[in-house]
Design a protein with these regions (language model features):
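Iron-sulfur cluster-binding electron-transfer modules in prokaryotic oxidoreductases
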Residues: 1-285
């Protein structure tokens, strides 16, 4: 049946290198997928302002995706957390579900609650599997060491059910190791959650996270919000925090793409703002 792809707002705009690298990696691995249409934001940015608006947007998105009858691939930790949380609310609150469906009915939509959705890291780990990925590696990263940054919402909060273990998240770490690299896990926040209300504090946290990875070959991420804070805002984070090192920041889909034979442009490393040229140079391409 294949999959339906919902990149999310941030990956389709600000962090376009994530979407581009994910699409080219999926194609290279012969994953059958198509883009979802008539979709909207997951609504999570609205949660603290209008919780009903948030619930409605996530419910609408799920109802549209349900219509494809296929499992859905998500790129964003926030989208995955939002859909998981709202699904739990709607499945447990019949009155809330009825209210949502009364609004969706105006568009001929209905929330059923049977959408199967996975973060792309889950898809790579569970559906494709480590062995198949390892067999596709053309040039590994032996001799490299990476700092692993799954992102807060990939494994928290555990009361709504997250893709990875909330105490010892391992999926992204394992996926990096099959490429031949050493890896160390870091669970510190990138600073996004406070960035929009206190930019300096957010950038300080991002800079602190970069400093923790200063003795590695780079930070491997799987969340577009981490990409904004540590890659797009790299220079600002270094300036505000006083960090003076050089730490490439890239998505796992970009790292995997290089390992399976894609070019730096195929995985859109030209769109990264952190010093990824250091990584490309050491990799020798």
């Amino acid at each position: 049946l294949g999959y339906i792809l919902y990149p999310g707002c941030l990956s389709s705009t600000d962090q376009y290198q994530y979407e581009l690298s994910a699409v080219n990696v999926l194609k290279s691995l012969n994953v059958d997928f198509s883009y979802a249409e008539n979709v909207n934001c997951c609504g999570l940015p609205l949660r603290s302002i209008n919780s009903y608006g948030w619930v409605y947007l996530s419910a609408r998105l799920m109802s549209v995706l349900e219509g494809y009858g296929k499992p859905c691939i998500l790129l964003c930790n926030w989208c995955h957390a939002s859909l998981t949380y709202v699904k739990k609310l709607l499945d447990e609150d019949e009155a809330l579900r009825s209210w949502v469906n009364s609004l969706l009915e105006r568009e001929g939509l209905k929330y059923k609650g049977d959408l199967n959705f996975k973060h792309i890291i889950q898809l790579l780990y569970e559906d494709i599997g480590l062995e198949k990925l390892r067999s596709n590696v053309k040039r590994g990263f032996k001799g490299f060491k990476f700092s692993i940054h799954p992102g807060c919402l990939y494994f928290r909060p555990n009361d709504i059910g997250r893709p990875d273990d909330s105490h010892e998240p391992h999926m992204l770490m394992d996926l990096v190791k099959i490429l031949g690299a050493d890896a160390e896990l870091c669970l510190d926040c990138c600073g996004w959650s406070i960035y929009n209300t206190n930019a300096n504090t957010g950038l300080t946290l991002a800079g602190s996270r970069l400093k923790l990875a200063s003795k590695t070959d780079g930070i491997v991420i799987a969340c577009p919000h981490g990409g904004v804070m540590m890659d797009k805002n790299y220079e600002e984070a270094c300036k505000v925090s006083g960090f003076k090192g050089d730490v490439p920041v890239l998505y796992y889909t970009q790292l995997l793409g290089l390992a399976i034979g894609l070019s730096p442009r195929d995985v859109a490393l030209n769109l990264n703002k952190s010093p990824v040229n250091l990584l490309i140079g050491k990799f020798g391409i």
